[in-house]
């Protein structure tokens, strides 16, 4: 049995190819069934995200399997091998195990250390469980990878620092305000960055969340998810004073929040401080706002400096994380090799039990026929000894005849001979 991992990701393939090799939730069950129908495949997991598509497999043997799997992948997605081969990577054994551990820990992600990938790996694992496509070895490998990812998060600082604009904005807010549960937040816009910020702030249980957007319908979808109030862009001037934190990211060519608007809001707030985080390019907040007392304005460039500093911290943490992966993958492979001996041990024990039972039955029969008990006992011990040492004796003799000193020493060690 061999463990394999093959696939493409953001480092090896452009998005134009990645999107053509994606397995959608609607097609995943069919894909797993098709994959498991391939010769020599004992178990399979399909991991498909926007940045990677990977197959994790346990196979009877790996000889000639690479061409078979590439052909299956290309046939399934109606691609030619030439389109895929240059972007495909292939790992087996310890390399496959360590690759999965790195993926689950966020060490192979576009954003180093990002936590979302672990949830995606767990979902892929659960999908294979439901589809009954997991082998025992694959199940153990994935469970081990989950524990390694948890250990990496616990023992290193891989996830402690913000490395996305949205997360950096929220981290900045948490640094300035002791608790987000007492603050009101106004989000301006409803794009991806604002969506991420809204979810993060919702998780930290802000007191009140407001979303202002040009398209009310889009804002309402996000607001329903994060329990926010939707307001129009025209309402910002009137409602700005309610906000302790403003995070803005729109595509407006002109500023939405001007100096006069913030001055009026601060007056209503009796000069209680406001944090304004302007992520937009062009800027949503007039730069002169930053000159106002009690108005703390940060631009996307300010956040980028935080992100770059934090990325350096994550890269240092990644070195520690890689050490954990090396150790854990080695431990897993040792366990896997030990498992290969389990069946042999079981067969050897069964063989010994069979010999014991046969000779024991004969001895009991002799005793029942009145034979001398001491003679029967000695005869049983002699015959059982001969049965048990017969195969090892033949192996020792053959190794000696072949002049194979290394095999002879292995046999001696196995038999406990000094």
Swiss-Prot record:
The active site is at 50 (nucleophile). Pfam families: GlutR_dimer, GlutR_N, Shikimate_DH. It comes from the Bacteria. GO terms for molecular function: glutamyl-tRNA reductase activity; NADP binding. Keywords: NADP, Oxidoreductase, Porphyrin biosynthesis. Pathway: Porphyrin-containing compound metabolism; protoporphyrin-IX biosynthesis; 5-aminolevulinate from L-glutamyl-tRNA(Glu): step 1/2. The keyword Transmembrane does not apply. GO terms for biological process: protoporphyrinogen IX biosynthetic process from glutamate. NADP(+) binds at residues 189-194. Catalyzes the NADPH-dependent reduction of glutamyl-tRNA(Glu) to glutamate 1-semialdehyde (GSA). NCBIfam families: hemA (TIGR01035). During catalysis, the active site Cys acts as a nucleophile attacking the alpha-carbonyl group of tRNA-bound glutamate with the formation of a thioester intermediate between enzyme and glutamate, and the concomitant release of tRNA(Glu). The thioester intermediate is finally reduced by direct hydride transfer from NADPH, to form the product GSA. This is Glutamyl-tRNA reductase. It comes from Erwinia tasmaniensis (strain DSM 17950 / CFBP 7177 / CIP 109463 / NCPPB 4357 / Et1/99).
